[in-house]
Amino acid sequence: MINITVPVFDNDYFVIVDSESKELAGVIFSYVGSKSKYVPLFEFPITTIDNTEYNEDNLDEHAISRRRSREFNIKVKNALHRAGGCKYLILGNLDKDQRSFLSFLDDYNLIEINNVSEVDSFLSPIVSKNKILNCREDELLNALYYAVSNDFILKIDNSSPKFVEVNFATEGLVVIEDVDRVSTVVAVNYALSVNSQIKVIPPLKVNHIDIRNFIKEWKDGDDNAYNDLSAELYNGIQDLDFNLYEYATFFTVGGPYSLILNNIIPITHVHLRFSPDFFVFNNIFFENAQNVNSALVFSPKEFSDEETNYVINKLEEGNFYVKDLVGDNATLYNIDHHVKQYPFDVLHFCSHGGEIDGHSIVEEFTDRNGVKHVIEYDEVLAFAIQKGEKTVGVHSKNIWRKFDGLIWGSREFKEKMIPNYIISDMINEMDRRIDKNRTYKKVIENSCMIKCWDSVYQAMFNIMAIHHCPIIFNNTCWSWSDIADSFLSVGVRGYLGTLWEINNGIAKKSAELFYDKIFSENVLQALQSSFLPTIGKRDENIYIYWGLPFTTLRPATSIAKSKKNVAEELLDSVWDWEDRLQQTKKKSTKEIMEALVEWGINEIETNFRKEAIEIISEMKDSQQG
């Protein structure tokens, strides 16, 4: 097993910094950071409005920002509770709009720092460091790592001499793409907490679509595409000798470094775009927390020979309670509700995956100022049919392509700085229209799905596993990106996916070897064992792991106890949703909550009646006692 100690939280400090205030986050961390402990550090996304009441029935230009900020408040408040509180709650460059969303500020000793020049006056009285290291902004991360390692505090001075990197002998390596976000400071924080060396490299010049296209062209027979991908990813790491380390973690915007490095050592990845602050925090917390010891196994039985039964048996050998969504139970309705509303620590997918068909749509609309625009996008639909339900759930995903002729997300698109209200007008208008100018397409690029018994699953959710952070093994084709994004954003401890279309025999053997080791070694080491069937084959290096190297799954005491854990979580969830219903005004939101409550009650009555009665009886006895 990889020898790595799980970090502990530093309960003295809890830091929340505006996501674009990288230098400020670095200077603050130089004061409060230390080796071998992890300071809870989070980046607050940009907010365009304060937390005021509004008409939720119509999407306005602030809807995305408002929802994102409210979700951040819930998640960071939970993290603060899980960390055990703090002596000092430090806010870095949060404006009044951002602060208005934080509902817990009055409960803690609050320190508000607006810029780098204020850091020393606020933090020097509460820390014992007094040695100073001057550095330039462009050398922040390397200097920060050295400063915290040697009890220096950091001062930004762009006239300083060039910082000379100092490498320490460590077992682990953390490679950080130097994007202009606070998340890179989170990466330094993590590296110090696990006593790993860092290597800062330039940001990638390619995005996940470019990377996927390189891989697709390579697998279609163009070896130059692999060379082009390698050239992009090797920039910055070509001088590293990975044989000096036992494992490496890449903080990246999507680079599959394990592929181009041929898994020379055990490698994990952390996505810098999908809440890396919560990803690291949750991995640390749930490694030592009491888990539910529950698993979901999903398979519509698409293959004559697959790993499904083997996986179920291995998880049950570890005394996990396994809920199998297999055969005609592997429906879109079932997987959608279980992912959102069922407590689990492991989810295994065995099915077909990848891109699917849909429609291309071109529509003209007029914004609130009377200006006409043309939007081009692709639409993918799926239908969740459940016997006994009065309505059919429609899962619609739009993939934006062009706006007024500009490629969505391109440099030209960003430079145009389209106002938020135009985007909200566009979305509202598209939602209202029933008849659209649709053209069928056999393959929708960048679409992603998992084949169900009756439809396809596109992983569209914002809650998961009743706030547990599970490990996902998506053993379908092309599962490393796009469909992985929802899981990484909402919160997992680990996500294992494939970089291209995998051979079913390889997928089966690899999964079986992985679960053979899952309770005796950590997840990363179990993954190394699963590589054996791929060596020398077309699928060599096909798997990529989004996770951290210390993550483990521990066996439970008994399946009966694990099943009771699930029942208890389901009961708590139903009661929680019922409480929220009383406070909710929006009709559509109430309908969603009512459906979740109804599903939870039905799940308890159908599969956990005995356990629920026992739990409620114990609660009554406890209250009477």
Please describe what each predicted stretch is.
Residues D180-V182, N243, T249-M426:
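A domain-level signal for caspase-like cysteine endopeptidase catalytic cores
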Residues I74-H81, C86, S117-D151, N213-N235, ...:
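Low-complexity, serine/threonine/proline-enriched polar segments
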Residues F14-V17, L89-I90, V174-I176, F251, ...:
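Structural motif
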Residues D106-V116, T268-S275, T366-R401, H467-C469, ...:
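Short acidic, glycine/proline-enriched helix-loop-strand junctions
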Residues M1-K22, G26-E287, N291-V292, F303-D305:
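Alpha-helical transmembrane segments and their helix-helix packing motifs
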Residues D97-Q98, G354-H359, S481:
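Short glycine-rich, flexible loops that bind phosphorylated cofactors or substrates
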Residues D336-F344, M460-M464, I483-G491:
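Mature extracellular/periplasmic domains of secretome proteins
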Residues S196-E217, G405-I434, R438, I466-Q624:
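Active-site-proximal C-terminal subdomain of hydrolase catalytic domains
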